């Protein structure tokens, strides 16, 4: 919160209406005397309401002697004078028990908080209508750097306010996952309850925070805990109606038939809260019918469709049949009938795959998230190989031996690099071995003012190296993340980027060679004795009917040549820039938003010209650089055309072209801190000592002629480090860019 904006004190009851455990009603009010019923209206369930009219009492006290106002705006100089003149102490309390530390904490005045603590302020003093500690005030504004400072100085995280909420409950209600990560590493019991038996998981489920629900469940929270009214987290999630929360709870084994004290099951709650549609969909996504029972499929298919290994193989091999069926129908039937029959057959086979996906494990419910697309390529590659071995090779080897040898070499190379790119670890950032190690990492990031979404992953619980990104498909952070490619069903990162580039280059060359070979092959074949075509002329008809299957297959792979060429061009340009696809699409930048002049101004605002005392980094970065920035969980809707544009890499191609043709001086363009010039960038990529055929050391690569490890790169190389710092591009999520 800006120091120039009047702050507010948490009010004791304004945010408590809505969550209750009365056995006679669906949860309604927390801490209220007579719990109201939850209606279908938007019942705001907040613990503390911060009204803008609440601020430290002003009266006629001059600003220079108003200790509360001085604490609020963070003026250390005047505060020091008050202490020197013995007018106040750091433990001064007003008539409500509020201390200067409360006001400094809620206004994110890090330097003032540290100053007060160093002067003996009681870190656990309770005050205000809510009888809360400074740490609680800070937690309700998600000022987790302040919370960390107070915890370091002895703040007790298990203290409760007048309504029985501790700091974990307050942090959960505001939904900040980073604050929860900090608190859970303070040995706070994950299932600690409030006065009415609500756990943090219940609050997260009620508020509809999927990231917080996931965090609590991964931390070991009891998914079937019950409060004083007998409600479980699943009941609370259905009150809010958040599909991701409900689905996550069911996946973790929530009791689908648990009843409250007044006999209400989750289904009953869903009906009363008008969230039945969410309830049914979550059940379906997790493999249950509308009654909550496990779906039973005919012919014993249930066990097969629920088996991830079996379904992975099915989705990969099914397109082999689809490609063959489409090519066969188009090549063996009259064109008027072939096209509609081929479309019906193709969509029919795809419908089977989609129905199988609807009963598969939850991560396979969307066809694009399965190995289906990689199977399309593998099937095409397989039938090209079969056609070449049994048709093209015998007819052309004697007349075109060199061309055949070249094609065979590039076909084998394409297959090898494809399989390697698909099966190799793309560069997953190693996870820490224990929670104690996680805590050490978190403390180190706090010391460096880097505990934020750009430097720490709340899913993997690891420090994110530069150029890394968390892949939702792989559920891991990937070093030097390029993109998640559905055509290889794997991420492309530090370990397999070169193999991926070699794969598409060999594919490009292989397609061109095969087209030349099949042209020579068709010319060698004798023309059919009798032939009749409905559309094309007689001469072309005779040419096509010599081997229609091979020609249709040629047409299919020629279409693939278009997007493969664009993909090759994009990757080669990015290699010359030492840039990944993700960086290309989201922008490489040095963060110059906090130059030295702003650092100085911030230090003055904090009441000191010392960067250290003001809680600023050497580059002027404040102690809370990204805390006010919210994170949207609302996914973008993409049309069919845009989805295929992403899948085929067309959007990346045009983005690269626009960047190359952009007007304006180069000095105005975002700087790439990893570029060493075109020649050096290309040499680093292609002359990397890692083997072309075999695994490389995880995370290693060359940068400026030196071996670096992207698994452990947390600082920009000094050669490019000036007055700014590198800022990773972890804002949007183009998971399907190729």
From Swiss-Prot:
Residues 1-314, 358-372, 423-498, 570-738 are cytoplasmic. It catalyses: L-cysteinyl-[protein] + hexadecanoyl-CoA = S-hexadecanoyl-L-cysteinyl-[protein] + CoA. SMART domains: ANK. Residues 455-505 form the DHHC domain. Residues 18-43 have a biased composition (Polar residues). Residues 1-63 are annotated as: Disordered. ANK repeats lie at residues 96-125, 130-159, 163-192, 196-225, 229-258. GO terms for cellular component: early endosome membrane; Golgi membrane. This is Palmitoyltransferase akr1.
């Amino acid at each position: 919160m800006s120091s120039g904006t009047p702050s507010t004190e948490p009010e004791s009851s304004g945010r408590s209406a809505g969550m209750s455990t009365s056995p006679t009603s669906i949860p309604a009010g927390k801490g209220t005397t007579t719990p109201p019923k939850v209606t279908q209206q938007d019942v705001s369930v907040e613990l503390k309401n911060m009204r803008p009219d609440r601020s430290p009492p002003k009266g006629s006290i001059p600003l220079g002697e108003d200790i509360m106002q001085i604490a609020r705006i963070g003026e250390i100089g005047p505060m020091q004078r008050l202490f020197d003149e013995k007018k106040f102490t750091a433990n001064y309390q007003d008539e409500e028990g509020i201390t200067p530390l409360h006001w400094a904490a809620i206004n994110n005045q890090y330097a003032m908080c540290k100053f007060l603590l160093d002067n003996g302020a009681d870190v656990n003093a309770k005050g205000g209508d809510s009888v809360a500690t400074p740490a609680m005030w800070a937690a309700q504004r998600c000022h987790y750097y302040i919370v960390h400072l107070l915890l370091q100085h002895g703040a007790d995280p298990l203290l409760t306010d007048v309504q029985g909420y501790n700091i974990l409950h307050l942090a959960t209600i505001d939904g900040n996952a980073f604050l929860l990560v900090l608190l859970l590493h303070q040995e706070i019991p994950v299932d600690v309850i409030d006065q009415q038996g609500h756990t943090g998981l219940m609050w997260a489920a009620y508020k509809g925070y999927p990231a917080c629900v996931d965090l609590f469940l991964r931390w070991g929270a009891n998914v079937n805990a019950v409060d004083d009214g007998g409600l479980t987290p699943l009941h609370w999630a259905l009150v809010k109606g958040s599909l991701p929360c409900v689905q996550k709870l069911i996946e973790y084994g929530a009791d689908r038939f648990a009843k409250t004290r007044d006999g209400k099951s989750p289904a009953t709650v869903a009906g009363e809260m008008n969230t039945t549609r969410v309830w049914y969909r979550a059940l379906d996504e997790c493999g249950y019918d509308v009654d909550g029972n496990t779906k039973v499929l005919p012919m014993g298919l249930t066990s097969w469709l629920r088996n991830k290994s079996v379904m992975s193989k099915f989705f990969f091999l099914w397109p082999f049949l689809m490609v063959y069926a489409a090519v066969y129908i188009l090549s063996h039937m009259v064109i008027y009938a072939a096209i509609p029959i081929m479309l019906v057959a193709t969509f029919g086979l795809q419908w089977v795959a989609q129905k199988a996906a609807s009963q598969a494990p939850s991560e396979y419910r969307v066809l694009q998230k399965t190995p289906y697309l990689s199977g399309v390529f593998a099937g095409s590659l397989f039938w090209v190989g079969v056609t070449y071995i049994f048709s093209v090779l015998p007819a052309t080897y004697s007349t075109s031996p060199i061309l055949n040898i070249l094609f065979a070499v590039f076909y084998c190379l394409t297959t090898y690099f494809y399989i390697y790119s698909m099966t190799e670890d793309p560069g997953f950032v190693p996870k820490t071995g224990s929670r104690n190690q996680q805590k050490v990492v978190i403390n180190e990031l706090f010391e460096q003012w880097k505990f934020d979404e750009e430097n720490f992953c709340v899913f993997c619980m690891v420090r994110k190296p530069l150029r890394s990104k968390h892949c939702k498909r792989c559920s891991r952070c990937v070093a030097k993340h390029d993109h998640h490619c559905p055509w290889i069903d794997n991420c492309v990162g530090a370990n397999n980027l070169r193999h991926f580039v070699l794969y598409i280059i060999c594919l490009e060359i292989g397609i061109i060679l095969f087209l030349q070979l099949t042209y020579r092959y068709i010319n060698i074949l004798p023309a059919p004795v009798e032939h009749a075509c409905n559309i094309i002329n007689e001469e072309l008809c005779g040419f096509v009917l010599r081997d229609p299957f091979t020609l249709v297959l040629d047409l299919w792979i020629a279409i693939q040549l278009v997007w493969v060429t664009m993909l090759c061009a994009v990757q080669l340009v990015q290699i010359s820039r030492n840039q990944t696809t993700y960086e290309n699409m989201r922008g490489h930048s040095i963060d110059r938003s906090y130059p030295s002049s702003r650092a100085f101004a911030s230090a003055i605002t904090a009441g000191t010209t010392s960067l250290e005392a003001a809680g600023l980094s050497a580059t002027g970065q404040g102690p809370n650089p990204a805390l006010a920035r919210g994170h949207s969980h609302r996914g973008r809707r993409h049309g069919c055309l845009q989805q295929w544009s992403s899948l085929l890499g067309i959007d990346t191609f045009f983005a690269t072209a626009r960047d190359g043709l952009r007007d304006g001086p180069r000095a105005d363009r975002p700087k790439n801190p990893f570029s060493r010039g075109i020649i050096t960038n290309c040499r680093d990529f292609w002359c990397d000592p890692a083997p072309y055929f075999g695994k490389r050391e995880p995370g290693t690569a060359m940068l400026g002629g030196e071996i670096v490890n992207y698994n452990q790169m947390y600082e920009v190389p000094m050669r490019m480090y000036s007055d700014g710092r590198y800022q990773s591009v972890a804002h949007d999520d183009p998971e399907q860019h190729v």
